[in-house]
């Protein structure tokens, strides 16, 4: 940029000098000197000559004076025509002009040099402050960059040192992972071996199962053949049973006739007997109304005794518990070993069955006669297969007549056999296999088995099927008491007994 400014200033000075020289030349020309102008390219040369006499006429020349002058200078023939004095003057003028031009050149150079130095000094002074500011800014930026580079170098060194410190741990972790990988590969190989062994065993099992299946199919075919033969035999047996049933119906008719005769005979004997003691009672044997009277008479041992129930044709053997919870209890039901079948009809449950010393049902009619003449309470004792015992006691107990379907009525529950009664308290009729009196279309006596006071199958049934442990669970038709062991647990033992309230 400085060189361009210097060149510009030099050009301006040269123009000024040239204009000054031209002005001087014009002034001298005005003084009476002749001028000679020579044009060479972009340059123009002016020569001052003294005035001379007119030249002799010559050939016609071009109107262009510059061209004429150049040709007169270049052509020696024309110069030869000039007078010698004029030539000398011209040469002298040329020399003077040359010297003057050299002086002018030196002067111009001197002036330009001084002017250039001044301009350079001024420009240097004008640009020193910005350059200093620029240098300071560059220095600050350089310092900041150096600091950043120093920080980055320190961070890099820290990271490098941390990586160097972590290299042993990384190496150990890598070794550990390699060892684990080897162990996993070994385990995988072991599992592959076990898998192949299992596949072989599976193939062997499949082969064995196919063989067993073939054997089962063969046995099935044999069983089907046997079943067809047995079906034919059963058909023959059914035919025989029809004949036996026919004979049995005849025997039942005869038995019914005999029973009627026996009742008539007993009626006749009773009419002739003494009112205080029936004729068929053994001499010396004392008869009581229930076990409470037996205990009041002085008996203290529990066992089988004879009682005379009102409206009964003969005395009944009953089991009296004279020790439990104050005694005086007359047993009306006992289950303890499953020796007696409780899947009975209405008539059996009415008259009673079993042995009073063991499993038995005293009979609905006897219980009705006992509870008809006095107010009784009921006690139910239960035992599970784990040896746990519980009881349920009802303060008032009454059983209706046969016309009332031996309807049950109990009031005042207490005991340890559940938070509430598993026995329906009021107006529940008795049902058996052949007399469905429950409030359900499903015939609970057939589904739950036995005879009981079912109310939509209810929460209890102590006359169900006797199941021995461990087959006593999940049995809906077993000996059940819901609030003691749940709805499907069949109990080990149960007792039902009654006694008068005035005791």
Swiss-Prot record:
It comes from the Eukaryota. InterPro entries: FIB_ANG-like, Fibrinogen-like_C, Fibrinogen_a/b/g_C_1, Fibrinogen_a/b/g_C_dom, Fibrinogen_CS. Residues 1-24 form the signal peptide. Residues 84-238 form a coiled coil. CDD domains: FReD. The keyword rRNA-binding does not apply. Binds to TEK/TIE2, modulating ANGPT1 signaling. Can induce tyrosine phosphorylation of TEK/TIE2. Promotes endothelial cell survival, migration and angiogenesis. This is Angiopoietin-4. It comes from Homo sapiens (Human).
């Amino acid at each position: 940029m400085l060189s361009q400014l210097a060149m510009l200033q030099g050009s301006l000075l040269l123009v000024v000098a040239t204009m000054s020289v031209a002005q001087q030349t014009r002034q001298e020309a005005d003084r009476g000197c002749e001028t000679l102008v020579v044009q060479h390219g972009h340059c123009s040369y002016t020569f001052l000559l003294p005035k001379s006499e007119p030249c002799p006429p010559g050939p016609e020349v071009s109107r262009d004076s510059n061209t004429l002058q150049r040709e007169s200078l270049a052509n020696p023939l024309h110069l030869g025509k000039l007078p010698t004095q004029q030539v000398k003057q011209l040469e002298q003028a040329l020399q003077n002009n040359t010297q003057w031009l050299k002086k002018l050149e030196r002067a111009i150079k001197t002036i330009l040099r001084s002017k250039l130095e001044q301009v350079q000094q001024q420009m240097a002074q004008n640009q020193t402050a910005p350059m200093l500011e620029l240098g300071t800014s560059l220095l600050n930026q350089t310092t900041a960059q150096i600091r950043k580079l120093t920080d980055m170098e320190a961070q890099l060194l820290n990271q490098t040192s941390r990586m160097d410190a972590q290299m042993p741990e990384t190496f150990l972790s890598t070794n550990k992972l390699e060892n684990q990988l080897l162990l996993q590969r070994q385990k995988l190989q072991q599992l592959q071996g076990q898998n192949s062994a299992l596949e072989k065993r599976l193939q062997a099992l499949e082969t064995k199962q196919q063989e067993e299946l073939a054997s089962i199919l063969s046995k099935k075919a044999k069983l089907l053949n046997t079943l067809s033969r047995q079906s034919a035999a059963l058909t023959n047996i059914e035919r025989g049973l029809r004949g036996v049933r026919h004979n049995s119906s005849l025997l039942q008719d005869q038995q019914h006739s005999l029973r009627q005769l026996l009742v008539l005979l007993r009626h006749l004997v009773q009419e002739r007997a003494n009112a205080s003691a029936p004729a068929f009672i053994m001499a010396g044997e004392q008869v009581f109304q229930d076990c409470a009277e037996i205990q009041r008479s002085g008996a203290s041992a529990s066992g089988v005794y004879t009682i005379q129930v009102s409206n009964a044709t003969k005395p009944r053997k009953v089991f009296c518990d004279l020790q439990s919870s104050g005694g005086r209890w007359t047993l009306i039901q006992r289950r303890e070993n499953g020796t007696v079948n409780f899947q009975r009809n209405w008539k059996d449950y009415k008259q009673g069955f079993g042995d009073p010393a063991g499993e038995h049902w005293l009979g609905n009619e006897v219980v009705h006669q006992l509870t008809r003449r006095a107010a009784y309470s009921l006690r139910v004792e239960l035992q599970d297969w784990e040896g746990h015992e519980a009881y349920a006691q009802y303060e008032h107990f009454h059983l209706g007549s046969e016309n009332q379907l031996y309807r049950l009525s109990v009031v005042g529950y207490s005991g340890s056999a559940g938070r509430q009664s598993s026995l329906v308290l009021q107006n529940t009729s008795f049902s058996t296999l052949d007399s469905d009196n429950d409030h359900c279309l499903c015939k609970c006596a057939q589904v739950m088995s036995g005879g009981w006071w079912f109310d939509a199958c209810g929460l209890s049934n102590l006359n169900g099927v006797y199941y021995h442990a461990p087959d006593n669970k999940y049995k809906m038709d077993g000996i059940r008491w819901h609030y003691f062991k749940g709805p499907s647990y069949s109990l080990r033992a149960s007792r039902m007994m009654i006694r008068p309230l005035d005791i």
